[in-house]
Amino acid sequence: MTRVKRGNVARKRRNKILKLAKGFRGSHSTLFRTANQQVMKALRSAYRDRKKKKRDFRRLWITRINAASRQHGLSYSQLIGNLKKADIQLNRKMLAQLAVLDPASFGKVAELASQAKG
């Protein structure tokens, strides 16, 4: 068999991992084996939490909308149901922004929703 010289390839592979581990504490940023484990764990967590972030924000928006709609005498589910009946197409992010930044406008939207009950 012929000899395969892989010194450069191996060093590049290790340096790539160590570069990703920059800023980790202790040996996690200097020793290849522990750095490799921590980088894999960090990438797994980052992937998982990108998905979780979407769920977390939706929960936050719903909580804010619920709190604001109860001030106008509607529960969250009633508000959303009535908005659908009235064909008002505001998503939860927009409604939450209105509730926080412009409560008067949110009040108008809630009023329209309560009129659409029937």
Swiss-Prot record:
PANTHER family to which the protein is assigned, alphabetical: 39S RIBOSOMAL PROTEIN L20
Phylogenetic placement of the source organism: Bacteria, Bacillati, Cyanobacteriota, Cyanophyceae, Nostocales
Source organism, top-level taxon: Bacteria
Organism: Nostoc punctiforme (strain ATCC 29133 / PCC 73102)
UniProt key word Chaperone: no
Single GO MF descriptor: structural constituent of ribosome
Transmembrane annotation, as ranges: none
One GO BP annotation of this record: ribosomal large subunit assembly
Pfam family, one: Ribosomal_L20
PROSITE patterns: RIBOSOMAL_L20
Keyword Ribosomal protein attached: yes
Name of the protein in its database record: Large ribosomal subunit protein bL20
Keywords (A to Z) from UniProt: Ribonucleoprotein, Ribosomal protein, RNA-binding, rRNA-binding
Protein role: Binds directly to 23S ribosomal RNA and is necessary for the in vitro assembly process of the 50S ribosomal subunit. It is not involved in the protein synthesizing functions of that subunit.
Cellular component, GO annotation: ribonucleoprotein complex; ribosome
Family stated for the protein in its record: Belongs to the bacterial ribosomal protein bL20 family.
